[in-house]
């Protein structure tokens, strides 16, 4: 083991395993290993750079961030949530309760619930689509129109004016009229 101290206050120690430990005046440390691995001890975190290019940041609050060579970034939070940012810009959040939220590069949001039901919000038209475990689907448009397709194929549509149209699987159409407008005051 050999230690050199420089006028700048830096201290470099060559350890028996061939690694180099640099202590800086600000209290941070840099540890370089013979295999190319580098570990940096900072005030708020420990940063590790693996020989294969993977970077791992361990924060004092328990957050761990791993950045892969392909640009994928994975963040493990102390509460158990995992947030992954993919090279294409998509972001996935896995929550402790089992829900998964995915924001696609185009802004579309897809939330998969623990019970396997799925809610999708399409950014291009603001439409929300709810796919339930039983197979039924509810779609809600920005203008207030709602359409539900039941597992037997029955389609129920409610329009913004309050009118409801139901089309049964046998082709029967049931339609209600829109409620009358409120009289002027």
Which positions does each model-derived feature cover?
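Repetitive, compositionally biased segments used for assembly/scaffolding
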Residues: 1-185
